[in-house]
Amino acid sequence: MQKEVKKSWALFLGIGTMMIAHGLQMQIMGIRSVLEDFSVVTIGIFMSGYYVGYFIGSKTTPNLVQKVGHIRVFAAFASLASLSALVAVAYVNPFMWTISRFITGISLVSCYVVSESWLNDRATN
């Protein structure tokens, strides 16, 4: 058991870092949207883009993992998540933020699904 955990430390570190960064991003986007005087409805719409992406990503990721493998899917979606965070910083626009949140939802759930299936593949029992 300890041998398997030692082999997977990079995966745990990567997922932990992404969870911390995402938690900060969610808080900062909410605060920034109020400072930019977005309406409450607009804030609700672009913040819900994350959950729409989360739902779609959970349905599409297993097929991608079967086609190209765990490491490639994880790397691609981790990169996409960081790109969407940069887009949100570069463009202060509710439409772009909705797209950014949607991509973040797809990316993070994909990384979570990949890490879980990766650990299940490594499990011996």
Regions found by a protein language model. Name each.
Residues G57-G69:
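Helix-to-loop junctions at the C-terminal end of transmembrane segments
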Residues R32-E36, K67, W118-A123:
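Helix-to-coil boundary motifs at intracellular loop junctions of multi-pass secondary transporters
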Residues D37, G69, A90-M96:
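Helix-breaking motifs and short loop linkers at transmembrane-helix boundaries and internal kinks
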Residues R72-V87:
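Structural signature of the two symmetry-related core transmembrane helices
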Residues E4-Y51:
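Helix-loop boundary and gating motifs at the non-cytosolic
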Residues F102-N125:
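Cytoplasmic helix-loop-helix junction between adjacent transmembrane helices
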